[in-house]
From Swiss-Prot:
Keywords: Acyltransferase, Amino-acid biosynthesis, Arginine biosynthesis, Autocatalytic cleavage, Mitochondrion, Multifunctional enzyme, Transferase. It comes from Schizosaccharomyces pombe (strain 972 / ATCC 24843). GO terms for cellular component: mitochondrial matrix; mitochondrion. Pathway: Amino-acid biosynthesis; L-arginine biosynthesis; L-ornithine and N-acetyl-L-glutamate from L-glutamate and N(2)-acetyl-L-ornithine (cyclic): step 1/1; Amino-acid biosynthesis; L-arginine biosynthesis; N(2)-acetyl-L-ornithine from L-glutamate: step 1/4. This is Arginine biosynthesis bifunctional protein ArgJ, mitochondrial. Belongs to the ArgJ family. Its EC number is 2.3.1.35, 2.3.1.1. GO terms for biological process: arginine biosynthetic process via ornithine; glutamate metabolic process; L-arginine biosynthetic process; ornithine biosynthetic process. Substrate binds at T189, K215, T226, E312, N440, S445. One of its GO terms (molecular function) is glutamate N-acetyltransferase activity. It catalyses: N(2)-acetyl-L-ornithine + L-glutamate = N-acetyl-L-glutamate + L-ornithine; L-glutamate + acetyl-CoA = N-acetyl-L-glutamate + CoA + H(+). InterPro entries: Arg_biosynth_ArgJ (IPR002813), ArgJ-like_dom_sf (IPR016117), ArgJ_beta_C (IPR042195).
Amino acid sequence: MQTKIFARLAGIGRARFVGTMPDKTKFISKSGTYPQGFSLNGIASGVKANGKKDLAILFSSRPCNAAAVFTKNAFQAAPVQVSRQTLNGCGGKDIHCVVFNSGCANAVTGEGGLMDAQLITAEADNLTRPHWTSWTENSEEFPSSLVMSTGVIGQRLKLDKIQSGLEHAVEDLGSTHEYWMRAAEAICTTDTFPKLVSRELSIAGKVYRIAGFAKGAGMINPNLATLLGLFVTDAPISVDAVRSILRHAINNSFNSISIDGDTSTNDTIAFLANGAAGGSEITKSSPAYKEIRDAVTDIAQQLAKLVVRDGEGATKFVTVQVRGARSEKDAALVASTISNSALVKTAFFGEDANWGRILCAVGYSGAAVNPPATTVSFIPADGTEPLKLLVNGEPQNVDETRASEILSQDELTVDVDLGCGPYAKTNWTCDFSYDYVRINADYRS
């Protein structure tokens, strides 16, 4: 009955508003340039009842320096706890594998869930150890695998399927674009397309490659979200530099997006560097550090934007640009409050230039605001002139036809100038459609 109601509502919405979802297949990577020394696979192990891919493994025969960032949700899933313990124990050194599963979050599953996550890392170590090129004391004392899970909360993993699936996945590891896509597909849940980005850069005559993939479409809010991600490079980067690069990349990408304001129990993004490209170790004081950091950040931003574009039921990609804030904190507060506002997001879906909702969000954000100095504009994606809605606190005679034209496009920018100071922040968000309600109402059915 509920499904019929939601379908009927969705039909009304599509008739009343613009109608069709934007084509998202254009965002799927068709080829790539991938780091040396990594191989991976993604398969259907049977965790998902629909037979889709649900298990992925990435392997480096060379030991990696590694770092990860995790959810701030108090109910941290078993894989989050186990991966954090692994990295703390080994000091971020000698990581060889990352195992992903989708379809079951292994969250709020007690001691049994922790044991399941530990068994998965042990199984990955046992299966790949014959292919390691070097051993250290860490290799003997600590696990060399990280684990990430996503899916329904409160259910135990089908451990027998995971273990059997890992055996099959390791038997057919590969490094071509096809294998990277398999892994990117295997971590998806409500995603409508796999998110994979890669690039190559040359620094002082050395060529390095960086790749990343991520999943996420709902329960997305800064400080990560229902979001799993992995960046890898063949550059020789020190542990401290790996940690610093990851923090910078995340703060300027995944911590600047929102789909629905919810933060998951499982958020994890890791960064591995295996040094297979050779050369001197890159530290935070190395000339190459900033170029590597900026390249990883660029990939992180591309992936973060893909997550927003794939927001559950999303029909619009919205950039929220805040300027003139008194502090960095104020700029971030205003950007995130606008991005999370259900009233703002539903207005975008309805293609309604209701700028009062934007102004309302600015006002309750908790940031320092000077109403007589505040200016709000829509910036079209086609490069034409911005449409001023409010200038120095004064409402403008808005051309509603032009406003509707801007809002009918798949992309737009909301520009807010607070007129209070020099600080700025950019976030990325999407609209709320009827399909968002349908997808989440039917999630477990």
